[in-house]
From Swiss-Prot:
It catalyses: (2R,3S)-3-isopropylmalate = (2S)-2-isopropylmalate. It holds the Pfam family Aconitase. CDD domains: IPMI. The keyword Metal-binding applies. It comes from Oceanobacillus iheyensis (strain DSM 14371 / CIP 107618 / JCM 11309 / KCTC 3954 / HTE831). [4Fe-4S] cluster binds at residues 345, 405, 408. This is 3-isopropylmalate dehydratase large subunit. Heterodimer of LeuC and LeuD. Pathway: Amino-acid biosynthesis; L-leucine biosynthesis; L-leucine from 3-methyl-2-oxobutanoate: step 2/4. InterPro entries: 3-IsopropMal_deHydase_lsu (IPR004430), Acnase/IPM_dHydase_lsu_aba_1/3 (IPR015931), Acoase/IPM_deHydtase_lsu_aba (IPR001030), Aconitase_4Fe-4S_BS (IPR018136), Aconitase_4Fe-4S_dom (IPR036008), IPM_dehydratase_rel_enz (IPR050067), IPMI_cat (IPR033941). One of its GO terms (biological process) is L-leucine biosynthetic process.
Length: 468
């Protein structure tokens, strides 16, 4: 009788090409996602060594990090334009399908992969981007890689990897009304720290996880890297199967049903043993707001910034408070914002936009605040416009943009000015992440929307229109 296995062990075993004890293992890669920032040097390496892309059919490229979200022809700088031109040239030369910024499949790479059905349970997926962990929501082993590894995968369709350990993040109970997947993952990182997942693949289990939609699960797995993990995983179930049915890149009819049955067998076996387990109680979690300069510097909205004297790392806390322009023991509800960004690979999908729109409908953005909504893909934008979400946001005073990474990172036209304070639905609040000197507070789409209306952070649960 075979030993019970976790989903990670099953996928790893299925993709093992070569292993030696004490050395990295060689894994086969099922899907390689490429964007314009981390790929130019990789393609140049292929040219210098006279190599081809081994499996262009298993490689898919898009433009997302640098794309302008207002005027597609207006670039922040020459480097951004050169990177996008290089990707177009490289994809043409090496025979790779590209969704450029005018293509109907264009979008943030971690939004369009699932949207197209490229992301599937049991696959190994890599991309030159740390938030590749997003795809783990489908029961895929997905992780970010560096530029030299991008070249290796392009050339060989394999990658050398040290085998991580397994960590069960067990979520007990259910989330309360107005508390979101974003709040859950922020609370997990705040409780256990930004390094507790180092050396592990984290699998999320429990009642709350099972009740989540696929888009909520993507938010959870997206931020696994912020806990230090190599990847995040959620075992596939009927929710996964229903989401992928009919997607462009999956089989149809009986072939899909056969494949779906195989996917469901990938779920972690009942008696499988993890290397470690942590637990968190969902019903104790409130809407969250980060106060500092990493995602672990996060507290409930009803709380305040920490006391420097009582902090475990007082120097770190003092520096973060100084950079953020905050004082110790300051109520989170007293923090005013001047920018609001709803977007990024964490929270730019249709369900995210629907929830934010429910908060702002019939209201107005506070005077002096610049608020923008940036859909995660061309298709998300199209679907949102079909149901009138664009008009809801624009009537409230939000800017309605084209798809792209946008204000998540200071790499394109959409930046927060020095000293500006942004309520952001993105995943990183490092110093200068949204622009030189910018101050970032990570929140859910609902919390960001409420901050835009009120001008400061509020407990979104006080809004009668909070979706259940």
């Amino acid at each position: 009788m075979q030993k019970p296995q976790t989903i990670f062990e099953k996928i790893w075993e299925n993709h093992m090409v070569h292993e030696e004890e004490g050395k990295p293992s060689l894994l086969y890669i099922d899907q390689h996602l490429v964007h314009e920032v981390t790929s130019p040097q990789a393609f140049e390496g292929l040219r210098l060594n006279n190599r081809k892309v081994r499996r262009p059919d298993l490689t898919f490229a898009t433009m997302d990090h640098n794309v302008p979200t207002v005027n597609r022809e207006s670039f922040k700088d020459e480097i951004s334009k050169k990177q996008m031109d290089a990707l177009k040239k490289n994809c043409e030369e090496f025979g790779i399908k590209l969704a450029d910024m005018y293509h109907p499949d264009q979008g943030i790479v971690h939004v369009i992969g699932p949207q197209l059905g490229l992301t599937q349970p049991g696959k190994t997926i890599v991309c030159g981007d740390s938030h590749t962990s997003t795809h783990g929501a489908f029961g895929a082993l997905a992780f970010g890689i560096g530029t030299s590894e991008v070249e290796h995968v392009l050339a060989t369709q394999t990658i050398w990897q040290d085998k991580p350990k397994t960590l069960n993040v067990k979520v007990i109970g259910e989330l309360g009304i107005g508390v979101t997947a974003k709040d859950l993952i922020l609370a997990i990182i705040a409780k256990f720290g930004v390094q507790f997942g180092t050396g592990y693949v984290m699998e999320y289990t429990g009642e709350s996880i099972r009740k989540m939609s696929m888009e909520e699960r993507m938010t959870i797995c997206n931020m696994s890297i912020e806990a230090g993990a190599r990847a995040g995983l959620i075992s596939p179930d009927q929710t996964t199967v229903d989401y992928l049915r009919g997607r462009e890149m999956v089989p149809k009819g009986e072939a899909y049903d056969t494949l779906a049955a195989e996917w469901l067998q990938l779920a972690t076996d009942e008696d499988a043993v993890y290397d470690d387990t942590v637990t968190i109680h969902a019903n104790e979690i409130e809407p969250q707001v980060t106060w500092g300069t990493n995602p672990g510097m996060c507290v409930p909205i009803s709380s305040s910034t920490p006391s420097i004297e009582k902090a475990s790392y007082p120097d770190e806390v003092e520096r973060a408070l100084e950079y953020m322009g905050l004082t110790e023991n300051q109520l989170m509800t007293s923090i005013e914002v001047d920018h609001v960004f709803i977007g990024s690979c964490t929270n730019s999908r249709l369900s995210d936009l629907k929830k934010a729109a429910a908060i702002v409908k019939g209201k107005k953005v506070k005077a002096g605040i610049r608020a923008m909504v940036v859909p995660g893909s061309f298709l998300v934008k199209q679907k949102a416009e079909e149901i009138g979400l664009d008009q809801v946001f624009m009537d409230a005073g939000f800017e309605w943009r084209n798809s792209g990474c946008s204000m998540c990172l200071g790499m394109n036209d959409d930046i927060v000015p020095a000293g500006g304070r942004c309520a952001s639905t993105s995943n990183r609040n490092f110093e200068g992440r949204q622009g030189n000197g910018a101050r970032t507070h990570l929140v859910s789409p609902e919390m960001a929307a409420a901050a835009a209306i009120e001008g400061h952070f509020v407990d979104v649960r006080s809004y009668a229109s909070v979706p259940s």
